[in-house]
Regions:
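Intrinsically disordered, low-complexity linkers and terminal tails enriched in Pro/Gly
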Residues: 1-3, 89-103, 320-336
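Interdomain "pre-motor" coupling segment immediately N-terminal to P-loop NTPase/helicase cores
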Residues: 41-100
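Conserved helicase motor core of SF1/SF2 NTP-dependent helicases
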Residues: 46, 106-121, 126-236, 240-336
């Protein structure tokens, strides 16, 4: 069976655009060539590709999309290229456009923050329309970073009066009372990922100014007890390490004009043996509650180095095999 062959050309404005869509040292071009059998050659300001007609059509669509994104000021990564290839192959170009069209915020250094997967886009849209959003998924899915970006955007747009970020201050069995230094010294290491995200969005000087005014508060979860948080964007990070009692306490801090986001990874629970995770319980108890949105991220939503996705996949397969083995052992014991 023979397929119709064709050749097409994409022309760019200059070498800067060529590097922008093919990557430094053709890093992005190599990713593209891995996915297609067609011959792809870049020379001067022209990219020529030839092969089976349907595949050539997909390649043309891909390059046009990459060129469009680059011209919108978006630095392209290998993840962007791989994800775009997959979406185009599935005929979901419109969804890809919609996802990349929305810039959440521009960081202090001028970088555009956007959703990078449909799962992330769904998460962002859920946060926008929900009073409380629970985001569950592995590292690298942007759960916390995107929530912080939306919080900063809401603050800048005067939709809220302050941002409150918190996480459990006891992880991996460490008790704050046994750590050296004053309370700030003790809690800073636990809150550092939240500081990092805020520094990225605002810059150190603006962040410190907001903290001094009380516009931004970063504190351990225990500091939330007995408060009602009105007109606030509230984020609870590492929520898998809350107990059910702590989670209920946190949820009931919600006040008028506020928005709440809870993030965590239920495969990384550091609670002592016998302690249930408040995040797992909340996701179950609140799944049908009006105003509450629940998003579960998967491997496809990991936007880090490819090795991170591979590691997550390996652990998920391992956990699945262990679960099946436990079920088989239980069945065998029941039959004795």
């Amino acid at each position: 069976m023979s397929f119709l062959q064709s050749e097409r050309i994409i022309e760019v404005q200059d070498q800067q655009e060529m590097v922008g869509i093919l990557g430094r040292n053709d890093e992005l071009l190599r990713v593209i060539k891995e996915h297609y059998e067609s011959v792809i050659v870049a020379r001067g300001n022209v990219i020529v590709f030839s092969g089976e007609d349907n595949e050539v059509g997909q390649i043309e669509t891909l390059f046009k999309e990459l060129l469009f994104l680059y011209r919108q000021g978006m630095p392209l990564t290998t993840h962007d290229v791989r994800y775009s290839i997959g979406m185009i192959a599935e005929g979901r170009l419109e969804s890809l456009h919609r996802m990349y069209a929305d810039t959440i915020i521009v960081t202090n250094r001028g970088r555009q923050v956007k959703a990078k997967t449909l799962g992330q886009w769904d998460y962002v849209e859920t946060i926008k329309r929900s009073n409380v959003t629970i985001g569950i998924g592995p590292a690298g899915t942007g759960k916390t970073y995107l929530a912080v970006a939306l919080a900063v955007k809401a603050l800048k747009n005067k939709e809220v009066e302050r941002i409150v970020l918190t996480r459990p201050a006891v992880e991996a069995g460490e008790k704050l009372g046994f750590l050296p230094g004053d309370m700030q010294d003790k809690v800073d290491p636990y809150l550092r990922p939240l500081y990092d995200a805020l520094y990225d969005m605002l810059g150190s000087e603006t962040f410190q100014k907001y903290v001094a005014r009380g516009t931004i508060e970063v504190a351990p979860l225990a500091y939330m007890r007995g408060r009602t948080l009105n007109d606030s964007f509230i984020i609870l990070d590492e929520a898998q390490n809350t107990t059910p009692e702590q989670m209920k306490m946190f949820l009931t801090r919600f006040g008028f004009g506020s928005k709440m986001v809870i993030t965590g990874d239920i495969t990384q629970i550091d609670l002592p043996n016998g302690k249930n995770s408040g995040l797992k319980q909340a996701a179950y108890v609140l799944q049908k509650t009006p105003g509450v949105g629940i998003i579960r991220f998967g491997e496809a939503d990991v936007v880090r180095h490819e090795i991170v996705a591979a590691i997550i996949r390996a652990y998920e397969n391992y956990d699945s095999r262990r679960q099946k083995q436990r079920e088989a052992d239980n069945d065998n014991n029941a039959g004795k």
